[in-house]
Swiss-Prot record:
SMART domains: Catalase (SM01060). The keyword Cytoplasm applies. It comes from Zea mays. This is Catalase isozyme 2. InterPro entries: Catalase, Catalase_AS, Catalase_clade1/3, Catalase_core, Catalase_haem_BS, Catalase_immune_responsive, Catalase_sf. Catalyzes the degradation of hydrogen peroxide (H(2)O(2)) generated by peroxisomal oxidases to water and oxygen, thereby protecting cells from the toxic effects of hydrogen peroxide. Its cofactor is heme. Homotetramer. It is an enzyme of class 1 (oxidoreductase).
Length: 491
């Protein structure tokens, strides 16, 4: 027991074996029985040992179950105080401790790290004004734009509930109803669809967020991570060979940090004045299935992320590590992106299910700054408290509201309605991305799609929809796919 932190710690281990309650165990090799051959007694430590073992595992994440974490710091390199009042971005040279979790998305905790699958890239900043979670992926876009479809999307991507095998026909059936997914698939089926490891991988906040300055000026922002060592991906045959070690990316990250070869990323932002939104003919800046063109909205450097420490315990700092896009700090705010709004609720909700209502008290998730509220008790609450006043306000407790900080104050009015955005434009950016590939890369992209569309359970109707969608993105792409599939593209 650490007497200063009021919680168990292996740094204060007893020199001999004990029970969970601290009683000495004089024999941890044999069960207590009635005679040498008799039955085991319920009073034996054996029962506590088994009961604890039976409860070691917790529910795995419904997505991003397979992951690896590391610790380090974020250092500001460029002044953006004209855009945000965020304290941890207050000046170049300021460093903030972080923990980062990389992950695959769809498959289980023990699945290979060589699957064609998006990768999670989540960063927790332990700032002086609370924790900020930037919870993103390696691709800058997503499959869907409305969070109400998220459970259906995950079900379609997950293994078949009857056979527990991931089926292309299920995936292509679902996304045939969602042509906005084409842009994401232009990344996933491209050469970048299987990152070589976590160190050579881009990251993106994916959503549009909001920066708020000290004066209250609001700016739309997108966040991007770029590895200083460059991006590397696995070709399909390389992934098969690499799959002999199903934890290759975790091992690469751990070994690199242990050897002092610290991974590093540069944080860039793209910014947009919200008043410019109405002047964009074919782009909704809150559409998570689109990127902002860099020639119009250039990348601006902000700082660097360095991972220089491996985690001390996988369960405590990876499995119990919890991220939520709803965790923000003054100077950074949400946008009205429908998928982001969904994630703000869903992520904290799933952590309470997975880890319990007091998951933010766990060391990896707790803020490193002083904090104070009246959120009391609940399952597994181990915070040491001795206050007599558990309400607010009170003349017996001097605690007060924090100093006011600016938040967006846009006026919003409208009718209750369920609708899609007006600027869908689902085909332009996927087509541009395909045409930017060199011929050999295009050929590999086509080969992967022919393989997916050749699933014997895929109906002619669904295959025709996909040929039509890709033809609308790029006519020659649709024709090549149709030719390989001995079908005619439908326009």
């Amino acid at each position: 027991m650490d007497p200063y932190k009021h919680r168990p710690s292996s740094a204060f281990n007893a020199p001999y074996w004990t029970t969970n309650s601290g009683a000495p165990v004089w024999n941890n090799d044999s069960s207590l029985t009635v005679g040498a051959r008799g039955p085991i007694l319920l009073e034996d430590y054996h029962c506590e040992k088994l009961a604890n073992f039976d409860r070691e595992r917790i529910p795995e994440r419904v997505v991003h179950a397979r992951g690896a974490s590391a610790k380090g710091f974020f250092e500001v390199t460029h002044d953006i105080t004209h855009l945000t009042c965020a304290d941890f971005l207050r000046a170049p040279g300021v460093q903030t401790p972080v923990i980062v979790r990389f992950s695959t998305v769809i498959h289980e905790r023990g699945s290979p790290e060589t699957l064609r699958d998006p990768r999670g890239f989540a960063v927790k900043f332990y700032t002086r004004e609370g924790n900020w979670d930037l919870v993103g992926n390696n691709f800058p876009v997503f499959f869907i734009r409305d969070g109400i479809k998220f459970p259906d999307m995950v079900h379609a991507l997950k293994p078949n509930p009857r056979t527990h095998i991931q089926d292309n026909w299920r995936i292509l059936d679902f996304f045939s109803h969602h042509p906005e997914s084409l842009h994401m698939f232009s990344f996933l089926f491209d050469d970048v669809g299987i990152p070589a490891d976590y160190r050579h991988m881009d990251g993106s906040g994916v959503h549009t967020y909001t920066l708020v300055s000290r004066a209250g000026t609001v700016t739309y922002v997108k966040f991007h991570w770029r590895p200083t060592c460059g991006v590397r991906s696995l070709m399909d045959d390389e992934a098969v060979r690499c799959g002999a070690n199903h934890s290759h990316a975790t091992k690469d990250l751990t070994d690199a940090i242990a050897a002092g070869n610290f991974p590093e990323w540069t944080l860039y932002i793209q910014t947009m004045d919200p008043e410019m939104e109405d002047r964009l003919d074919d782009l909704d800046p809150l559409d998570v299935t689109k990127t902002w063109p860099e020639d119009t909205f250039p990348l601006q450097p902000v700082g660097r992320l360095v991972l220089n420490r491996n985690i001390d315990n996988f369960f405590a700092e990876n499995e119990q590590l919890a991220f939520c896009p709803g965790l923000i700090v003054p100077g950074i705010y949400y946008s009205d992106d429908k998928l982001l709004q969904t994630r703000i609720f869903s992520y904290s909700d799933t952590q309470r299910h997975r880890l319990g209502p007091n998951y933010l008290l766990l060391p990896a998730n707790a803020p490193k700054c002083a904090h104070h509220n009246n959120h009391y008790d609940g399952s597994m609450n181990f915070m040491h408290r001795h206050e007599e006043v558990d309400y607010f306000p009170s003349r017996y407790d001097a605690v007060r509201n924090a100093p006011r900080y600016p938040i967006p104050t846009a006026h919003i009015a409208g009718r209750r309605e369920k609708t899609v955005i007006s600027k869908e434009n689902n085909f332009k950016q996927p087509g541009e991305r395909y045409r930017a590939m060199d011929p050999a890369r295009q050929e590999r992209f086509i080969t992967r799609w022919v393989d997916a569309l050749s699933d014997p359970r895929l109906t002619h109707e669904i295959r025709t929809i996909w040929l039509s969608n890709w033809s609308q993105a790029d006519r020659s792409l649709g024709q090549k796919l149709a030719s390989r599939l001995s079908a005619k593209p439908s326009m």
